[in-house]
Every structure is written in C-alpha cells, then in structure tokens.
Amino acid sequence: MGAMVPPSRKSCYNFRVTEINRVLDGDTIDVTIDLGFDLYKKERVRVAGVDTPEKRTRDLEEKELGLDATAWLKDKLEGAIDGDDELSIRTELVGGVGKYGRLLGWLYIGDSNLSLNEQMITEGYAWAYDGGTKQKDFETLREIRRSFGTLIE
C-alpha cells in the first residue's frame, strides 16, 4: 500500500462541480463540471488514492462495508448535492483521466484543505490505493470504524 499524497493547489487542475448526478459507490461519482465560458461537461470521477469495498458482490461482509462507504460518501456530499456547499475536484493529470477513462480526482468540500479521499481512509471507509495490488483487509476497516463509533454490528 503506497502513500497517498493529494496534489497541492498550485500543482494541479481544479474543477468546480456544478451538479452531483449520482454516487455510484464509495469511490466513483458522476458529476457535471464547469469548464468556464458557460461550458459544462458530465464526467465519471474515480476518487483518487482510495479503494473502497465493493457493494455489488456476493461476499456479504464486503457488500455491507461497500454499502456503508457509499452511504458515507453520499452523506458527505449532501451539502454539495443540495447546493449549500461547493464541491471541487483536483487532479494532477493533464486531462485528469485514468486508464478506465474516468477523471481521477481529489474531492474537496468548500474551503477545506482535507480531502474527502483522506477522510475516507482516516475514518475507515476506504484503504489507501496507489494503483498496485489491492489489499482488502475488512477487519482493519472495522477496527478503525469501531474507534470512531461508526460501526453498527
């Protein structure tokens, strides 16, 4: 598992999200971004630097944690969905697109300097992921969530 380092404000591309169309799972959302000059584009965004448990799986333990991660992300994005807060996406890639054609981004609500990506890991809803082999250690996520008092068993 590699270190997760979000891009600095100076070394990245910033996109302002005008609409959150759908939260697909804990690490993928569909949004509309403002390109400027009254131009908008719908994008599928892969939350960079994290991997969440899958919600579409036969593994009941993983499914439960995947549904929790999706609900957590929806809850955090609720203000941006309602238009109360602004969601911005930062990416270091030119064009920002990863190998599956999705925008790879770090999600920020309002003026926060802490990304939702980092919060997901800190609060036990995701693992850090650098593109290598995925580590699915469900018990570690459960332990972190127990310490935050957010795990319902």
Predicted regions and their residues:
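Small beta-barrel nucleic-acid-binding modules, primarily SNase/OB-fold domains
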Residues: 1-153
